[in-house]
Every structure is written in C-alpha cells, then in structure tokens.
Swiss-Prot record:
Record keyword Cytoplasm present: no
Family: Belongs to the OXA1/ALB3/YidC family. Type 1 subfamily.
Transmembrane intervals: 6-26, 341-361, 365-385, 431-451, 473-493, 506-526
MF annotations from Gene Ontology: membrane insertase activity
Annotated Gene3D superfamilies: 2.70.98.90
Record protein name field: Membrane protein insertase YidC
Location within or outside the cell: Cell inner membrane
Main location, first listed in the record: membrane
Quaternary data: Interacts with the Sec translocase complex via SecD. Specifically interacts with transmembrane segments of nascent integral membrane proteins during membrane integration.
CDD domains: 5TM_YidC_Alb3 (cd20070), EcYidC-like_peri (cd19961)
Keywords: Cell inner membrane, Cell membrane, Chaperone, Membrane, Protein transport, Transmembrane, Transmembrane helix, Transport
Length: 550
C-alpha cells in the first residue's frame, strides 16, 4: 500500500508539472503571426483616431497605419553608447533598430542581440511624436539632423541626439537623451511657437511589434509576449495580442506605466509623475500591435516656448537595473515585468538568494550549488524524519512480506495487519513522501527563475556547460541525475509487488529523458539535491541500523 501511494505521488508530481507547463502556455497569447511580405505594409489603410474634442484632458494616439519603410530622402542616424547601438530614422524620428552590446544573439553567436528592428521578424519599433490641432510632427514628419553619427565620448555621462522639424512658424526640437551604463532613454519635445496663433498639442510615445515567429523558443519556455499596463488601482496587468484584437484600449491613468514584454527583454514607457496620461492599444494590419501613451495637452502661446518629456527603457529585464530606474523616476514595481508565474512569492526570494551568492562567487553555476545546499540545510530536519521512516520501513520489510503472504486472499485483513504493524513500529507509511512534496514547489519556482531571469541567459558554469539557461548539449548532467535516482532507489524500501517494482525501476529512465530537455541549471540543482539527499539518507540509515544493534 505504501509503495502504491509513493508511486501515485510521483506520477501525480510528474503530471502536475506537465499540466502546469500546459496551463502556463494557455495563459500566453496563442495566436501565431501570419506574416505577409513587408513591402505590402506601405499600402495598408490606417484606422481612424478617435475624436480629441470630446476628451481634451489627454491627447489621443497617432495610431495611423504600420511602420513604413524609409523613403529615399530619409536618413538613418546612428547612435552608440557603452551598452547600446541604435538607428533613428529622420522619417518620423523613430528608433528603428537597437542592439544590446552586452547581450549576444545566441551562446554560440557573438552578434549583439537586436531588440528593436524594422527589418526581419519580429517587427519592434519605438515611436514618439506630437499631435495637435495645429502643425505637429507626427508619424510622417521629416526631421533634419546636423550629423549622421553620435557616440558617447569618454568622460561623458549623457549623449543628446537632436532632430529638428519646422512648419508654419512652429519649430520642434525632438531630443533623445542616452546615458552611460543605462538602457533608459529620455524623449523630449521642445516647441518654439513663432506663429501668430497659440499652439496646443500633446506628446505620444508608442511601441509597435509583431508576435514572435513560431518555433523561436523551446517548447518548455512559455514566457509571455505582449503588452502590460501598471496602474495605481489595478497594479500590474497583461494585455495579450488577442486582447488588442478584441477591443481597443483607451484608459486615462495617473502615475502608471506601460510595457511591451517578451522573453528576457522589454520596452517600458514611463511618463512624468503627477500627470494623467492616456494609455491605448491598437490592432493594426499585418499582425502588428501597438501599445502607447499620450500626455495631457501642452499649451504654447504665440511667441513662447514649451516642452514635454517622457522616458523609454529598452533593454534586458535585469532586476537591479529595473529597481534603479524605478527609484530614479519614482516608478512603482517595474520588477513585476519579470514574471515567475503563480509561485512568484517563492521564486523572488530564491532569485534574491541566488543573486547574492553569485555576487560573492562570480559564477551562477556555483551559486546554484550553494543555494541547493542552503535549501537542503533548511529542510534537513523534515527530510530526516522522512528518511528515518523509510529506514524503518526497510527494516520491517520481512514482516510485511509475511503479512502479505498470510492474508493474500483477504486484502482488508492484510491492510489492517499492516496498519497495526506500522503503529507498533511507530512508522508513518507516507513519511517518505515528504521530501518530494517539499521539493515540487521549489522545483517549479527555480525552473522559472532559471528560464525567465535574463541574468542567467548564456551564463556559463564550467567545462562543457556554457549556458545554464539551455539544456546540456551532451546530456551528461541528465545522465548523472538518472544515475543518482537509481542509487536513491537502492536506499528506499523495495516494493513487494513485482509490477510496482518494475515501475520504480523505469522511473529514473523516464525522468532522465524528461530532464534532457530542461535547462542545465535546473538539472544541476536536481542532481546536487539528489547527491545531498543520498548522503543524508545513507547517514540516517546507518544510524537506524546501529541503534537496532546496540
């Protein structure tokens, strides 16, 4: 009976994991893009923007069409800092490309990771402009620049990239400000009204993107790709691409922020504090989706000047950086963009501990080993109770076999006799299940820490393990993990039933195959945990045997 329950528990644990991964996948946007040829984008009709006259408190989005290719008169302005290399088009003043210099495309490809792009898939572009009743540089504006390349100089902490637009006496200076050691970009519009009439308008910032093409991430990684909105009332909420298809969002909020999320990276739009902004979404042609925000109206009298500034964070979900940006701009909970699933409450302290250890040892693999040891120490007494119960079960196996043979034709009498034996020997038949029950939530939480934390992306361990976030290329760790499970089986009480015995013999091989697909960091944790468990179980088994002979 006890082995049946143990087998059932293990089976339920495996099924629970599979169901959890399936459930997580269902929570993500299921739609896959059907991408047309990019040249056809130019001819797409734009959805009409809603009327501004009815709601003058916040500007409405400039949501026309999709991203047009540069015309022949447009220039690409190249910008380089210590962390990013970007291209800004003079057509609309969009950030059309942005490479992350400290993050590789792949572990075996040193090319910088391209987060923003207007060529290839997925399309992801940052746009900013002005809208209003009078002249304003919107999506189709043509800006002038004094130079084609800007680079952050040694000893300088900021780099300004000005773009100039002028029409009918209204001059707009659009300035991108980049910073050293930062992925934060300020977007400032300076309006100089030399016209005879007063000028009124609003600033908008928006992100356009397509879903990732099918097959770009492994099946075991179901990280959310789509929009999100943070408000003081509802806190953090996701906006999937299917939500954008169903209805347009138009929501006024004070001191919020909006982000376009993907695995490991994101773009966040952060308004100035203390003002009410309108957040909006649009589903556009060519499987393109838009998430943006627009400011309250800016009034500039004739002969006067005014300006409006907002912020863009475009980079990796590095939690220290997100925390620093939040502190600098007085923004709440940017770290919520790092999604560890329903066990976030457990995953966050696990990541914190892992990060603190890595700061000391400077190796994420070693940090996983130390964290596993600390977890084992924390649950040492609980595990000891279970292992003592299993050791006692092992000791009474001959008596249990006699009971089974004596009452082979009367299952009720057999179970009653077994329970009396457990009571006499002070054995809890389910005691051996506790280590598994304890490890399941830790396992799931650590799984998401390893696959969702960009800090571990392409993080090397040693020897052949050069990326803890991807699977072992030679399957050595999964094979060692399977071998450790076989050793554990030898220490456990053997099942009496031959069918149960065969099932238990097969389980290590099933788990080995399963773990061949998991990140190497997770297998490293499980292998280390198994080795420590074997050592503890062997030690307790020897203690029980000595106490019996004393």
């Amino acid at each position: 009976m006890e082995n049946q329950r143990l087998i059932l528990l293990i089976a339920l644990a495996g099924i629970s994991l599979l169901l959890y991964f399936a459930w997580e996948r269902e929570q993500m946007d299921p739609a896959e893009p059907v991408v047309e040829e990019q040249e056809s984008e130019v001819d797409q009709e734009a959805p009409d923007a809603p009327s501004r006259a009815e709601e003058p408190d916040a500007g409405d989005p400039m949501a026309e069409g999709v991203v047009d290719p540069d015309d022949e008169d447009a220039k690409r302005v190249r910008v380089k800092t210590d962390l990013i290399e970007a291209e800004i088009s003079t057509q609309g003043g969009d950030i059309r490309q942005l490479d992350l210099l400290k993050h590789q495309k792949a572990s075996d490809d040193p090319t910088p990771y391209r987060l923003l792009r207007d060529e290839g898939e997925p399309l992801f572009v940052a746009q900013a402009g002005l809208g209003g009743d009078g002249p304003a540089p919107g999506r189709d504006a043509r800006y002038e620049v004094d130079q084609d390349e800007f680079e952050l100089a040694e000893g300088e902490d900021t780099l300004e990239v000005p773009l100039i637009w002028e029409e009918d006496g209204v001059k707009v200076r659009k300035v991108y400000t980049f910073r050293r050691d930062s992925y934060l970009v300020d977007v400032r519009h300076e309006v100089e009204n030399n016209a005879e009439d007063d000028w009124a308008g609003f600033q908008y910032v928006q992100l356009r993107r397509r879903p990732d093409p099918a097959g770009t991430t492994p099946w075991y990684i179901h990280s959310f790709t789509g929009g999100s909105l943070y408000t003081q009332e509802d806190r953090f909420s996701r906006i999937s691409f299917s939500d954008m298809e169903d209805s347009d969002l138009s929501q006024d909020e004070r001191d919020g922020w909006a982000a376009m999320l993907q695995h490991y990276f994101l773009g966040v739009m952060i308004p100035e504090r203390g003002e009410t902004y309108r957040y909006y979404t649009r589903a556009l042609p060519q499987e393109t989706y838009l998430l943006g925000m627009s400011s309250p109206w800016l009034q500039v009298a004739a002969g006067e000047s005014g300006q409006k500034t907002n912020h863009l964070f475009v980079g990796p979900k590095e939690q220290d950086r997100l925390t620093a940006v939040g502190s600098a701009l007085d923004v709440d909970d940017l770290r919520l963009t790092v999604d560890y699933g329903f066990l976030t409450i457990l995953a966050n302290p696990l990541f914190w501990a892992l990060d603190q250890i890595e700061n000391l040892v400077k190796n994420w693999g070693v940090a996983i080993l130390i964290l596993t040891l600390l977890i084992k120490i924390a649950f040492y007494k609980l595990s000891a109770i279970s292992y003592r119960s299993m050791a006692k079960m092992r000791k009474v196996q001959p008596k249990m076999q006699q009971i089974r043979e004596r009452y082979s034709d009367d299952r009720q009498q057999m179970n009653q006799a077994l329970m009396e034996l457990y009571k006499k020997e002070k054995i809890n038949p389910l005691g051996g299940c506790l280590p598994i029950l304890v490890q399941i939530p830790v396992f799931i939480a650590l799984y998401w820490v390893l696959v969702e934390s960009v800090e571990l992306r392409h993080a090397p361990f040693m020897l052949w393990i050069q990326d803890l976030s991807s699977r072992d290329p030679y399957f050595i760790l999964p094979l060692l993990m399977g071998a450790s499970m076989l050793v554990q089986m030898k220490l456990n009480p053997p099942p009496m039933d031959p069918i149960q015995k065969r099932v238990m013999q097969v389980l290590p091989f099933v788990f080995t195959g399963f773990f061949m697909l998991f990140p190497a960091g997770l297998v490293l944790y499980w292998l280390t945990n198994n080795i420590l468990s074997i050592a503890q179980q062997w030690y307790i088994l020897r203690q029980v045997e000595k106490s019996d002979t004393a």
